[in-house]
């Protein structure tokens, strides 16, 4: 049985690409035709590519790996959060902070700050601090939860990235490539497919299309994991992300 059907793709509007004047020639092999100034994506190829991506993500999950879901454009934010959480994975759906992967030592301090401020509220520290200081602490807390809440429990380098719109997420892609983290991505007709290891040619602007495809990647993780929890995965890996980043960065420099 196919991972996804042509009917599902058509109903979600996956086949609608960008205007013909806004395209990347490298996407030509994934384009079926042009209609009213808009490129139509070849859904037969999308079906095949979804299956390839699904099997790859499933294999990662079977081995106890993790996937970082990244989608900060408005059309992707909700689906990225919901599907990553459903699959017990990590996500960034507001803004990619520079160094999220390549400089995790600094990022981890900000993540740790979330817990520190929570503890201050729980142990009564807020009650003895000036009201102005408490307001500032709450603002700081809200900021870090907004940008980093989705990777709060990420203790090791993700096994792969899943991104919606490589043009929008170019910084995330650059960091992943530097650290040799494979990338699965929803790639529209205006994007460069060469940046992505597992290309899913599809409309990256329609909420239904993004939801459908992101959901399929979450399904792959759940099928592969078969009940293994994030806590068990983290315990099995037992790797500190900041240390792993340093090792990979050194390997890249030496190469």
Swiss-Prot record:
Which segments show compositional bias classed as Basic and acidic residues? 245-255
Q: Which Pfam families match?
A: Ribosomal_S2
Keywords, A to Z? Ribonucleoprotein, Ribosomal protein
| GO annotations of cellular component type | cytosolic small ribosomal subunit
Give the GO biological process terms. Answer: translation
Q: Where is this region: Disordered?
A: 233-255
Transmembrane intervals: none
Gene Ontology molecular functions: structural constituent of ribosome
Look up keyword Endoplasmic reticulum and say if it applies. Answer: no
- Keyword Ribonucleoprotein applies: yes
**InterPro entries in the record:** Ribosomal_uS2, Ribosomal_uS2_bac/mit/plastid, Ribosomal_uS2_CS, Ribosomal_uS2_flav_dom_sf
- Give the UniProt family note: Belongs to the universal ribosomal protein uS2 family.
What PANTHER family does the database record attribute to this sequence?
30S RIBOSOMAL PROTEIN S2 PROKARYOTIC AND ORGANELLAR, SMALL RIBOSOMAL SUBUNIT PROTEIN US2M
Q: What is this protein called?
A: Small ribosomal subunit protein uS2
For this protein's source organism, the top of the classification is:
Bacteria, Bacillati, Bacillota, Bacilli, Bacillales
**Originating gene:** rpsB
